[in-house]
C-alpha cells in the first residue's frame, strides 16, 4: 500500500535517531516502492506491426500504444504511481460503481485501471488525442469491465457548461496524473478542477515537480481546495495528493 511514511519507534529510540538515519530509511522506502511500481512495466519479446508497451495491474496484462511525437500520448511515471495507488488501496478508495473522471487521460492507462477496478469511468483529453485514447481503452476493457468506460473531449476551461453541465457532474473521484507542467493553460486547468468538483468529490492527483511554476500552481490550487500529501517519491520528483473542496457542506 502506498502511504505517507510514518515511524512509531519508542521515544528513546526516536530521540537517538539522527536526521541522516531518517533520510536513509526514507530513501530505502522510496527505492523499494518505486522499483515495485516500475516492475509493472514490460515490453514485447518480439517486434510486432504495432508498437506497444505492457503493464500489469489488477491481474490484467494491459497493452498501451503510445505516440512518441506527442507529449500527451506517452505513459509517464506519474500515471504508474496513480495506477499502483488505486490497485493497492482498494479498501480506502473503493472504485466499484463510483463515478470517476480522468482529466488529461493521455494514453488511458489510469482510466483503464479504474475501469478494471469497477468504476464508471469517463476518460477525457484534447480532440487530437481521443483516437489513440479510445483505441487503448477499448482493447484493454472490452468484456473485462463491469461498466463500459466513456471517452470524451475536454479542453480545459472551454465549453465546460455545455459539455459538462454542473447539474450532471456527480463525480465521486477526479483522477489526474502529470497534468501540471510548463504549459500555458494552468489557470484553465484550475477552472476545470473547480467546475467538475462537487462538495463530496475526491481528487487524486499525481504531480512531477520540475519548475517553480508548479509550486505557484499548488498555491493557487490551495485557495480552492484542501490539499493533503499522501505519498512522496523523491527519486522520481513525484508527489501524490488528495484534495477536497474548501468550505464544503457535510454530507
Model-assigned labels for residue ranges:
Residues 1-251:
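S-adenosylmethionine-dependent methyltransferases
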Amino acid at each position: 500500500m502506498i502511504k505517507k511514511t510514518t515511524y512509531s519507534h519508542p521515544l528513546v529510540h526516536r530521540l537517538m535517531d539522527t536526521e541522516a538515519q531518517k533520510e536513509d530509511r526514507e530513501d530505502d522506502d522510496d527505492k523499494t516502492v518505486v522499483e515495485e511500481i516500475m516492475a509493472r512495466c514490460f515490453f514485447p519479446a518480439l517486434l510486432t506491426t504495432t508498437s506497444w508497451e505492457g503493464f500489469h495491474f489488477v491481474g490484467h496484462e494491459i497493452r498501451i500504444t503510445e505516440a512518441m511525437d506527442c507529449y500527451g500520448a506517452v505513459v509517464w511515471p506519474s500515471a504508474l504511481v496513480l495506477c499502483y495507488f488505486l490497485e493497492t488501496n482498494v479498501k480506502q478508495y473503493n472504485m466499484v460503481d463510483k463515478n470517476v473522471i480522468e482529466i488529461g487521460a493521455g494514453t488511458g492507462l489510469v482510466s483503464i485501471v479504474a475501469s478494471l477496478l469497477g468504476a464508471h469511468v469517463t476518460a477525457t483529453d484534447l480532440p487530437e488525442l481521443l483516437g489513440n485514447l479510445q483505441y487503448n481503452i477499448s482493447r484493454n476493457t472490452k468484456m473485462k469491465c463491469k461498466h463500459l468506460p466513456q471517452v470524451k473531449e475536454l479542453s480545459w476551461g472551454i465549453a465546460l457548461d455545455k459539455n459538462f453541465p454542473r447539474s450532471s457532474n456527480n463525480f465521486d473521484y477526479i483522477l489526474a496524473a502529470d497534468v501540471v507542467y510548463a504549459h500555458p493553460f494552468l489557470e484553465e486547468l484550475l477552472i476545470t478542477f473547480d467546475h467538475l468538483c462537487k462538495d463530496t468529490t475526491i481528487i487524486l492527483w499525481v504531480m512531477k515537480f520540475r519548475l517553480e511554476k508548479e509550486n505557484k500552481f499548488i498555491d493557487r490550487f490551495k485557495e480552492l481546495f484542501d490539499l493533503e500529501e499522501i505519498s512522496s517519491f523523491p527519486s522520481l520528483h513525484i508527489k501524490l495528493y488528495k484534495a477536497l473542496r474548501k468550505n464544503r457542506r457535510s454530507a
